[in-house]
Amino acid sequence: VPYFFAIFTAGIPLLILEYGMGHKYKGSTPLAIARTNKKWEWLGWWPTISAFMILGYYSMILSWAVNYFTFSFSKKWGNDSNAFFHNDFLQLTSSPFEFGKMVWPILLGIAFIWAINWFICYKGVKGGIEKASKILLPTLITIMIIIAIRAVTLNGATTGLNTLFTPDWSMVMKPKVWVAAYGQVFFSLSLAMGIMMTYSSYLPKKTDINNSAFMTAFANCGFEFLSAIAVFAILGYMATSQNLQIGR
């Protein structure tokens, strides 16, 4: 309930606002806001800086993913995946003030990710981002469908799915649930990040902004539910196999 309330009261309205501004003023977030009123241009730089900071740690996580993709062929993590991740892969030190050595696989992974990003951006919107999205988005959806189908066939998957789809009405009155719901909507739709405003600046002149906002929000919502089914089915399997409650 809080999630859907957040979608209709914040997600879709703010998408319409950002799409509308980007479509009308034809520019990045700082430029679009500057074209409305020059003295408010600085507001547009806040989400731009935030997006750059997020990109920094996203690149790190993607580097981990690239490395683990190569590890998966030989199951390099062995029997103790936690110890491998923290000690062998990350090579964590005992204190934040204790500097360790350079972890070259992670650095090379980051360089690889940035090189791909640079190439896509260099090719522009139509030749880069659009072409990449036409390949990567269907691939992502296909992979998630395969994972979800496999997950629901696992022993104990129904335990996880029952947890997902059985409402706990006592949680509705807790503020933290509403904060989490709105946070999820803002994060997953990239609201107030400047991304949607910049993308919409490339839309054709006669684009139906309202329809685009609804389609984006509902498509995102559908993918999140597909992901939730896969995750909770796997959690149910893990809880059953370890004879634990799913909440643990």
Segments from the language model and where they lie:
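Alpha-helical transmembrane segments of integral membrane proteins
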Residues: 9, 44-54, 133, 137, ...
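Hydrophobic core segments of alpha-helical transmembrane domains in multi-pass membrane transport
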Residues: 6-10, 50-73, 109-121, 138-151, ...
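Membrane-embedded translocation segments of transport machinery
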Residues: 130, 134-248
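Inter-helical loop and helix-membrane interface segments of multi-pass membrane transporters/permeases
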Residues: 27-46, 61-122, 126-128, 158-179, ...
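Hydrophobic transmembrane alpha-helical segments of multi-pass transport and channel proteins
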Residues: 8-12, 16-17, 57, 221-226
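Membrane-interface alpha-helices at helix entry/exit sites of multi-pass transporters
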Residues: 1-2, 35, 42-46, 207-216
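Short helix-coil transition sites and intra-membrane helix breaks within transmembrane domains
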Residues: 11, 22-24, 55-60, 185-192
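Juxtamembrane transmembrane-helix boundary signature
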Residues: 2-38, 234, 238
